[in-house]
């Protein structure tokens, strides 16, 4: 049995994202008093009691939409078409507004199961007969923020979908289990959403020339070469000093959190804007979090053919100079809008994910260590004894982390550590990922 799909629809700031978070198994939507925070349709696994379902949050819709509003309407229309049940939400504090009437007419023409959800009813609620004039036979009064009325909502959902009380059993989920989480990150307007739309061949995410369209992380399940992938679109990251609005601070926090839990991060760079310090700052954050990373230069079709060779040479020089921690990181040049080289990006993600998970046997490690330290010996101490690394072992993967035992670890210089790390990359084919070394002092200083 596949999961039922429930779509939340309503004008801006009626509490759709609050209810989305309330019903979601884990919080996924940014909530803010500013209308219009949600701009893409957003999916999550939801649950009321023992009933599990797929929940879709949609952008708020208004009358007389501008160009952006028309694109938001397309997102909502697609979510309605996918739905088994629609929850049309209105604000109980403000009563029925013209936009509510417009939306009720819009929703009813699809002939879907529908519940009118009157939200923000924390206090004694004087029910307005105007709600009945919207044309729905099922009306539920709730407070999404405080969680009141959810039992009534549950009962209405069960009745509308004719679900029997066998819902305690697990509902089959084709995407259950391990998956490769790929976060697409970068500065605003680099083409992150356009890239994901190109991968899935669907205008799933809102795109346009305006910077900062994406305001929260959007997850999309996808299958590629027998691998379950979760593609995660994120809000663009700007310099801290340029972030002033509280909403953008929330969006930035959401992106940082997505990177923290990613397996692989695609750092998307706008070819027309070239490599900026903020791109390097984002890359360093990804590295510090220990994530695997690939660098994708988008809008390659807009670079003059005569300039491409010089562009690439300068780009590789900047990456190798400023990001030595990920020497050999994959760099791909694509056009997301033309779908040029986009599959190469996913191939690179699969490859670097395997490297990020690499485990090297202790025997091979110490054979390599013995040879490498003989080729380039460690320095002598003042007492005349040589600093030695006696033994090493791999303590974890994701990223590969190693513990090295030395008679005097504080005397091992950063330059010697870089020598070991770079040699390890070449020997074990571990290019493009962070590698971590931890030094431990031997109990016996004379060995």
From Swiss-Prot:
One annotated GO biological process: ribosome biogenesis
Top-level division of the source organism's lineage: Bacteria
Signal peptide stretch: none
UniProt xrefs under PROSITE patterns: G_ENGA
Binding-site list for GTP 1: 10-17, 57-61, 119-122
InterPro entries associated with the record: G_ENGA, GTP-bd, GTPase_Der, KH_dom-like, KH_dom-like_a/b, P-loop_NTPase, Small_GTP-bd
Gene3D superfamilies linked: 3.30.300.20, P-loop containing nucleotide triphosphate hydrolases (3.40.50.300)
Residues binding GTP 2: 186-193, 233-237, 298-301
Record-annotated disulphide pairs: none
Domain EngA-type G as annotated: residue spans: 4-165, 180-357
Listed GO MF terms: GTP binding
This protein's record includes keyword Nucleotide-binding: yes
UniProt keywords, alphabetically: GTP-binding, Nucleotide-binding, Repeat, Ribosome biogenesis
One Pfam assignment: KH_dom-like
KH-like domain sequence ranges: 358-443
Subunit architecture: Associates with the 50S ribosomal subunit.
NCBIfam families for this protein: GTPase_EngA (TIGR03594), small_GTP (TIGR00231)
PANTHER family according to UniProt: GTPASE DER
Family membership: Belongs to the TRAFAC class TrmE-Era-EngA-EngB-Septin-like GTPase superfamily. EngA (Der) GTPase family.
Function comment: GTPase that plays an essential role in the late steps of ribosome biogenesis.
HAMAP family named in the record: GTPase_Der
Name assigned to this protein: GTPase Der
Organism: Rickettsia typhi (strain ATCC VR-144 / Wilmington)
Gene: der
